[in-house]
Amino acid sequence: MKLTASANHTLDALLELVCVELQLTETQDGKSRGHYGAVADWLSREGSPLRGFDPHIFPQGSQRLGTTTKPIGKSEFDLDAVCKLTASQDWHPGELYQLLWDRLYANGLYRPMMKRMPRCIRLEYAGDFHLDIAPAIPDPACGGNCILVPDLNADLALEHPANNVWKSTNPQDYADYISSFFY
């Protein structure tokens, strides 16, 4: 069925309204970038136990792709970040996770916002969004931008280390690949 120009224009306008409602506003995007920067500063500043591992914080997933949308039935956006450290694979996943947890917990602002998740630590910001931060190390088996993230039951990570493993992933190259189709 072929649409008239008027009907096509109406559908385009409707889709644009839906997209605007689902994505971060410019203000929210600016706030999220500010939070990424503040977390990165806290993790890498002088006195941080992570500083010696050269922490690099970067967005991943929809935030990296610029396609962030509010999940259906949720009032907040789900933003994802990686905290890549130069630590070796000799680290146990639970130890690395705990190191990141302890550093975030040392900040009185972040402490009440923190929640343990299987592969990340969630900071629940009031209202607009939460930020999931996954600790990571380089994946020597894959090279390039590949990283290893903990795949663990966060509550049992240190008590039952045999149940926790590293999971290989490559969010940077994945985002670049997807972006190559659109930009």
Language model region names:
Residues 83-87:
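Short beta-strand-to-loop capping motifs
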Residues 1-76, 88-95, 120-123:
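N-terminal regions immediately upstream of nucleotidyltransferase
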Residues 80:
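Glycine- and aspartate-rich repeat motifs characteristic of hemolysin/RTX-like Ca2+-binding segments
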